[in-house]
């Protein structure tokens, strides 16, 4: 059972266990040990980060751990998570490490790993890494003299990723004449994203491009779509694009400032790909959090949807297993597997813009392909993770709501993979009604296991 790794690597408040320099160094050593094959060549691991203040100390600790095991390090500096995955693959490195807590506030940080092919590590390798942290096995294998590793800085990493992103956009199209509001959330994409859209011909109004180490995701980025919504109306832009701290997710808004979430972007792109015979097996992979409106939209055009557990890694695993090429989450993690190995906010925005260009339609019109069912999400902070159906009053309330909804909606209750939260999600035809039911369940949960 993994204790350290959550659904997206190791995460926590920087400088408090487990997100300490000591743990980072041990993780570096364990990763180097695992990825070092028996061949005699030099081994290399890529390390990138977002713009958090604590990224510097964790980066240094990881470098020390990796080099102490005789593996070299390639430092790419602040770069989107998908960019680090891409460079890990293109530079033929043995693994990649991302120092980021994604959409969390600046005081948090995280460490996650990619294997040499650019995909996130499977659970069993994370478990192996965890077991090695306190193992004496590593101690006996420390190299000396010329065998220790060294660190190199890759100065053109951002430029390489910009070229990769531009090459993912159809060569017969451009963005000339489009006005784009772009909010980088003071995160990892602050240099890369504006350059990509500008070089493809768009007029870019950049927001959240002045990181100072403490302002990442602070009232900006994909968790605050109201920022791009207001700016789009103010500047009369064609689209607003908001990225999170490590730019692996994207939320957009149309020319009227209305939010278009991950489900709607998937509906637009999937229906376009079906029309062009590009969607493999006419199948989209989404998670259980996706709105039922997405299922309906896909069925209308002869497509189907497969649902996985929450977490983009599970979406990618299902896509690879079934040979599918489009998947994602409502939160804006969108995976175009023909182009990249993980969720990529900038790449997803480019694919959406390509549909707008190809169809010569505004985003508001394209978004009509999906009519979302009213959905309510209530988060409750909890002191313990108890199976919710073993708490009698909560279980009775949930079953009662499910009976009332019948086939016209659903109840989904799950714990967050990264925070002490229970997420209560209801879907149904009447928003007022389901909001009341969601709050009733939330109140019962607070009484039983809520944070004191």
Curated annotation (Swiss-Prot):
Described function: Catalyzes the conversion of glucosamine-6-phosphate to glucosamine-1-phosphate.
One Gene Ontology molecular-function label: magnesium ion binding
Identification of the protein by name: Phosphoglucosamine mutase
Similarity remark: Belongs to the phosphohexose mutase family.
Names of required cofactors: Mg(2+)
SUPFAM superfamilies the UniProt entry points to: Phosphoglucomutase, C-terminal domain, Phosphoglucomutase, first 3 domains
A single GO BP: UDP-N-acetylglucosamine biosynthetic process
Residues with Phosphoserine modification: 102
Magnesium listed as a keyword: yes
Catalytic activity annotation: alpha-D-glucosamine 1-phosphate = D-glucosamine 6-phosphate
HAMAP family on file: GlmM_B (MF_01554_B)
InterPro entries assigned: A-D-PHexomutase_a/b/a-I, A-D-PHexomutase_a/b/a-I/II/III, A-D-PHexomutase_a/b/a-II, A-D-PHexomutase_a/b/a-III, A-D-PHexomutase_C, A-D-PHexomutase_C_sf, A-D-PHexomutase_CS, Alpha-D-phosphohexomutase_SF
Sorted UniProt keywords: Isomerase, Magnesium, Metal-binding, Phosphoprotein
UniProt: Mg(2+) binding residues: 102, 244, 246, 248
Pfam families recorded: PGM_PMM_I (PF02878), PGM_PMM_II (PF02879), PGM_PMM_III (PF02880), PGM_PMM_IV (PF00408)
CDD domains: GlmM
E.C. numbers: 5.4.2.10
Active site per UniProt: 102 (phosphoserine intermediate)
Domain of life of the native organism: Bacteria
GO cellular component: a single term: cytosol
Post-translational modification: Activated by phosphorylation.
